């Protein structure tokens, strides 16, 4: 496997460029996008929610503080994340980042999937929960690249969350590869422009376009911390097994929600004229 690219924003998008003969599909998840390069495609797996999980946790804290008469600025809570990560131990709690009400779409497709913590004890505090949520983004990235058959040898990052050095370290350790951050803003729009530039002949091929548009804007490689990488390699199988074991639980909860909604609809029929 070569370099791959992940965009860690509200959602998570994980991509690798491969020859069309090397496409590896898992079930009904993922996408394949044609590229303006001979026999090359982009294979993609996406998470319904990435930093939305962090937003949820921080807004829970902000709501609680507001109710007790201590309103807090959300941006200030975001600025505290790296400090909370530094004060907590890696790999103590599992969290599946399925906070979207639409469930998950990569690498599993399950509208009933829901987020949850595993491994809580009375000794855990808010920084431990934040760490578990942030670590889940690394686990989700590893999950998605595993579904594409190979983990990358280098991971290139875009998206707002890539500004956090602590998060970059977690992602590097989770996928077991150095990470590099692109300084280019709006990378998706730039990619569209690059494809158009090749299509109209402004560049002879995609490689020459990449050499000018992408490579000069990449930051230095940040290698994974060995102990953290070992921790996540040990933790990932438990993350995957727990996800599989939870599927019937999600289904039962969804059936309960649907039943409750049906009762509400029956007790509050729509009023209308005949």
Where are these regions (language model features)?
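Active-site core segments that coordinate phosphate-bearing ligands/cofactors
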Residues: 1-264, 268
